[in-house]
Amino acid sequence: TAQHDLSSLRAFGSTGEPWNPTPWWWLFETVGQRRLPIINYSGGTEIAGGILSCTTIEPQVPCAFTGPVPGMAADVVDDEGRPVRGQVGELVLRQPWVGMTAGFWRDPDRYLATYWSRWPNLWVHGDWALIDTDGFWYILGRSDDTLKIAGKRLGPAEVESIAVSHPAVQEAAAIGIPDPVKGEALVVFCQLRQGIQQSPGLIEELRDRITERLGKPLRPERIHIVRELPRTRNAKIMRRVIRAAYLGHDPGDLSALENPGAVEEIAAIGRAQGMPVTREESTG
């Protein structure tokens, strides 16, 4: 960053993937010199705008949003549709919004099933979210990417944040694969920083790091080092595609995929591992 004139920089805008603390702090401290705000913003095409955002007049909290965009009746609810604080739940809207999608072309039933079928009069956006005790909001990833391991439900971002806190890891993606005992077993794919070489010692370091933070039931079954992670053209990691490729399933619609070679690499790793995994094959 020292090679560039950043004197005109006033703030950072961020949207898309959930933040991990390590890159958030790097941007805030190294590029922003601890004085420029990071404006976190999250919404969707289907509502024609944002649901959550930040302001420049309220405290900055790593990876967080200060709250809903004005006019958005956002909330976080549990499996029964009840508001929750301090725990992960579904991001919903309690009132209509002027830009909200009114239907799918020639498929009204799928529209209702996608957004309105979980609870009466609640729009389900499809993201896991959390409101902490101080009132700050967090997006934790797509709810259809949720990991359910040994009776615990967690978002992949919780695992990925730990992986990328290791100085060797550039990016990470966590998925769950079928396990007859735990329901799902944790598998993590890591893209290393330039110049870092893969080694058995590094794999064990990462596995131990995640286990120490999350507990033994969430110890990764396997950790794979890949050249790159499948992502969309706007840089979102495609965990659904990663899981399907690894298990040898049809990945579905790939029209948004930016780097097909990444999917082929993961599919080859899955074949080499003899997916789908069983308890007897476990290496954890």
Model-inferred region functions:
Residues 38, 74, 172-174, 220-225:
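Generic structural signal for residues in well-ordered beta-strands
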Residues 95-97, 102-103, 113, 121, ...:
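AMP-binding/adenylate-forming catalytic core of the ANL superfamily
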Residues 11, 90, 170-171, 222:
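Residues at the N-termini of beta-strands
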Residues 3, 65-66, 82, 163, ...:
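A general structural signal for stabilizing positions within well-ordered secondary structure
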Residues 263-284:
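Cysteine/selenocysteine-centered motifs that mediate thiol-based redox chemistry or coordinate metal-sulfur cofactors
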Residues 10-136, 143-146, 159:
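Conserved AMP-binding/adenylate-forming
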